């Protein structure tokens, strides 16, 4: 399993499609930030389909991968959308 943090800046006409798509795999944190755990096959499928949704000449999607055993998250201020539980 991979733990991902995805941050994106995409054109206004694609932002809702990207947001809705990422919600099928990951937990929305705030604005254009998603995080969560995916399997290797989910990761491959997600990258392929995400690439089809964006325009690589205009849009930017940054994907950070973390081994789960090294994951530590610190939040300063209010947490916009807390994760109640992780399966």
Where are the predicted features?
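Basic nucleic-acid-binding interfaces
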Residues: 1-5, 10-87
């Amino acid at each position: 399993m991979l733990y991902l943090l995805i941050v994106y800046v995409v054109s206004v006409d694609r932002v809702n499609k990207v947001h809705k798509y990422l919600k099928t795999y990951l937990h929305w944190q705030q604005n254009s930030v998603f995080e969560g755990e995916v399997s290797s096959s989910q990761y491959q499928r997600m990258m392929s389909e995400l690439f089809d949704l964006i325009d690589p000449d205009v849009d930017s999607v940054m994907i950070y991968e973390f081994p789960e055993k090294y994951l530590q998250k610190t939040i300063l201020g209010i947490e916009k959308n807390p994760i109640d539980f992780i399966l």
